[in-house]
């Protein structure tokens, strides 16, 4: 492989950057701002960046800045920890099959309330406070995300199916409501909830929603904020620049496994479907998203379509 790698344990604290370095960063940003002016960026917001108040404020400022310099950010958010907290308060114990939460009627009500009523509105408020014009949506709004029940096959017996309730997979995405908001200078903030043919709600993996939405919007970039530095090789080094073909090789040799699989699969699908670049970024680093997109510095892994 020809990819670049760096030590993933390098100090991510940016507070030591002096005035001269800050000026250099601003100068580096100009060609990127020109290049991406008018382009759409879909951002999956999750992990520590959603729970640390300082990182929340940094994220909101970054999104507003991207909009102000002429880009079109679209935010898709998760909310697993917040859902877990709400269910615990209600005394409802989670039941999992092969790592997936079984989502019955009552759980789905909680999921919808937490994602669309709490988490989404917190994000909208932060972006607006930072000077942006954010609007909260779910996949129901404008008939955006049509979904169906996710079929889960038993990992040991493919002829056996597990019923995991109102966990959905995407049937289609109509991006017209998102495009209309972008045209009016708004920043869409989307909860990953779809609707079925009988108007039932489905909880959908936010990484999957972000990837599919980036594809249908013909986004320039998909940005995934995570709790890890990016894609690591077997020596624990950060791989900063990969092609879709190289990602396939990392799947094949077992370098990418476990909890990173669904995230990387979604990123790979987007890269293969026309999204020019996918960035997997350490959301624990203040302003890492801006630095990754607008400078020559690598603060995560970039997966290129070719």
UniProtKB/Swiss-Prot annotation:
<dbReference type="InterPro" id="IPR001057">
    <property type="entry name" value="Glu/AcGlu_kinase"/>
</dbReference>
<dbReference type="Pfam" id="PF00696">
    <property type="entry name" value="AA_kinase"/>
</dbReference>
<comment type="similarity">
    <text>Belongs to the acetylglutamate kinase family. ArgB subfamily.</text>
</comment>
<keyword id="KW-0547">Nucleotide-binding</keyword>
<comment type="pathway">
    <text>Amino-acid biosynthesis; L-arginine biosynthesis; N(2)-acetyl-L-ornithine from L-glutamate: step 2/4.</text>
</comment>
<dbReference type="GO" id="GO:0005524">
    <property type="term" value="F:ATP binding"/>
</dbReference>
<protein>
    <recommendedName>
        <fullName>Acetylglutamate kinase</fullName>
        <ecNumber>2.7.2.8</ecNumber>
    </recommendedName>
</protein>
<dbReference type="GO" id="GO:0005737">
    <property type="term" value="C:cytoplasm"/>
</dbReference>
<dbReference type="InterPro" id="IPR036393">
    <property type="entry name" value="AceGlu_kinase-like_sf"/>
</dbReference>
<feature type="binding site">
    <location>
        <position position="203"/>
    </location>
    <ligand>
        <name>substrate</name>
    </ligand>
</feature>
<keyword id="KW-0055">Arginine biosynthesis</keyword>
<dbReference type="InterPro" id="IPR001048">
    <property type="entry name" value="Asp/Glu/Uridylate_kinase"/>
</dbReference>
<feature type="binding site">
    <location>
        <position position="101"/>
    </location>
    <ligand>
        <name>substrate</name>
    </ligand>
</feature>
<feature type="binding site">
    <location>
        <begin position="79"/>
        <end position="80"/>
    </location>
    <ligand>
        <name>substrate</name>
    </ligand>
</feature>
<keyword id="KW-0067">ATP-binding</keyword>
<keyword id="KW-0963">Cytoplasm</keyword>
<feature type="site" description="Transition state stabilizer">
    <location>
        <position position="263"/>
    </location>
</feature>
<dbReference type="GO" id="GO:0003991">
    <property type="term" value="F:acetylglutamate kinase activity"/>
</dbReference>
<dbReference type="InterPro" id="IPR041727">
    <property type="entry name" value="NAGK-C"/>
</dbReference>
<dbReference type="InterPro" id="IPR004662">
    <property type="entry name" value="AcgluKinase_fam"/>
</dbReference>
<comment type="function">
    <text>Catalyzes the ATP-dependent phosphorylation of N-acetyl-L-glutamate.</text>
</comment>
<keyword id="KW-0418">Kinase</keyword>
<dbReference type="GO" id="GO:0006526">
    <property type="term" value="P:L-arginine biosynthetic process"/>
</dbReference>
<dbReference type="GO" id="GO:0042450">
    <property type="term" value="P:arginine biosynthetic process via ornithine"/>
</dbReference>
<keyword id="KW-0808">Transferase</keyword>
<keyword id="KW-0028">Amino-acid biosynthesis</keyword>
<feature type="site" description="Transition state stabilizer">
    <location>
        <position position="44"/>
    </location>
</feature>
<dbReference type="InterPro" id="IPR037528">
    <property type="entry name" value="ArgB"/>
</dbReference>
């Amino acid at each position: 492989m020809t990819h670049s790698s760096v030590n993933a344990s390098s100090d991510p604290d940016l507070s030591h950057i002096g005035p001269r370095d800050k000026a250099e960063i601003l100068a580096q940003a100009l060609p990127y701002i020109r290049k991406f002016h008018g382009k759409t960026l879909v951002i999956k917001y999750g992990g520590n960046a959603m729970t640390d108040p300082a990182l929340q404020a940094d994220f909101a400022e970054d999104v507003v800045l991207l909009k102000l310099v002429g880009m079109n950010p679209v935010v898709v958010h998760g909310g697993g920890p917040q859902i877990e907290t709400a269910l615990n308060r209600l005394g409802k114990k989670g039941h999992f099959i092969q790592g997936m939460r079984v989502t019955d009627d009552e759980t789905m009500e909680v999921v919808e309330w937490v994602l669309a009523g709490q988490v989404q509105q917190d994000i909208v408020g932060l972006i607006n406070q930072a000077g942006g014009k954010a609007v909260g949506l779910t996949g129901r709004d404008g008939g955006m995300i049509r979904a169906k029940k996710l079929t889960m096959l038993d990992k040991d017996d493919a002829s056996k199916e597990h019923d995991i309730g109102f966990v959905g997979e995407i049937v289609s995405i109509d991006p017209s409501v998102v495009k209309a908001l972008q045209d009016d200078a708004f920043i869409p903030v989307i909860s990953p909830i779809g609707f079925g043919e009988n108007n039932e709600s489905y909880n959908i993996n936010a990484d999957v929603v972000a990837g599919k939405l980036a594809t249908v919007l013909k986004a320039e970039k998909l940005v995934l904020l995570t709790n890890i530095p990016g894609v690591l090789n077997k020596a624990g080094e950060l791989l900063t620049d990969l092609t879709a073909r190289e990602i396939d090789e990392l799947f094949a040799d077992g370098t990418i496994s476990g909890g990173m699989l669904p995230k990387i699969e979604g990123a790979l699908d987007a890269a293969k479907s026309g999204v020019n670049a996918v960035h997997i970024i350490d959301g624990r680093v203040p302003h890492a998203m801006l630095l990754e997109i607008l400078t020559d510095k690598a603060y995560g892994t970039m997966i290129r379509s070719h």
